[in-house]
Amino acid sequence: MTAFKPIKEGKVREIYDNGNSLIMVATDRISAFDVILKNKVTKKGTVLTQMSKFWFDYTRDLLPNHMLSVDVQDMPEFFRQPQFTGNSMMCRKLTMLPIECIVRGYITGSGWASYQKTGKVCGIQLPEGLQESQKLPEPIYTPSTKAEIGDHDENISYEQSIDVLEKQFPGHGLEYATKLRDYTIALYKKCAEYALSRGIIIADTKFEFGLDEDGNVVLGDEMLTPDSSRFWPLEGYEPGHSQPSFDKQFVRDWLKANPDSNYDLPQDVIDKTIAKYLEAYELLTGKKL
């Protein structure tokens, strides 16, 4: 059996080169505030992979994505070990575009903090009198640059995203920037409408895109997971304050309340976190993991 070593390790994912494809493994690591925490959250990697699979299948008619298979029987023997089952995805190789494509349908988090100070979110002027967690009249696209591990992503305007892409892909900056914006909003609208019918509000999320060998824009990375999105329960939703959530917000809140924790979570916080992830998966897909 040929052993594989990751060619790239992110905060949560490991990527392996499989010749003409990649194998992306979502680990049980958890990060918050750009730091990898000391604890592992059992089953988290499986939730991320299976949820991405669900959304990739759901949106394939809108645009192509990089997923080839989540069945380890389709992968080299090395990946048929227990630690890779359920949390591994074989993907097409893409040239990734250097923009995090963030879309916000509701005003919350850093967007809410910015709006209170300036009336704007990432330079976009919003109507007066919005409340925290309120639905925006239309989803807004607020791209950022991709930072290396340890650095913070930097919010940029749509116009700046044209320049960033033009530098790397001369002659294509405007074309790619426009496609990223339009795909991001179209994907969000389609999926947010579906999620609402299943009792979940998708407040915001981020997508990443790449180019295939023919220069087509293809959806990559992960899709609409509790790691990349804010999911709120529809039941009990009311603007005017922060909302309970199915995502990492629980972990962030605990860390903020316990600044001396040294990024070491107690077991009950870990248990509640995975329970939230599993609940979101079951509500959205109608399946149990």
Where are these regions (language model features)?
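Anionic ligand-binding catalytic core segments
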Residues: 117-118, 126-175, 219, 223-284
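Intrinsically disordered, low-complexity acidic/polar segments
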Residues: 33, 112-113, 214, 228-230
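Generic recognition of stable, solvent-exposed alpha-helical segments in well-folded globular domains
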Residues: 46, 50, 175, 179-186, ...
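A long amphipathic alpha-helix within ATP-dependent nucleotide-binding catalytic cores
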Residues: 169-203
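Active-site loop/lid in soluble adenylation, ligation, and acyl-transfer enzymes
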Residues: 1-148, 261-289
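Coil-to-beta-strand transition motifs
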Residues: 21, 96-98, 198-202, 214-217
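Conserved metal-phosphate-binding beta-hairpin within the catalytic cores
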Residues: 103, 202-223
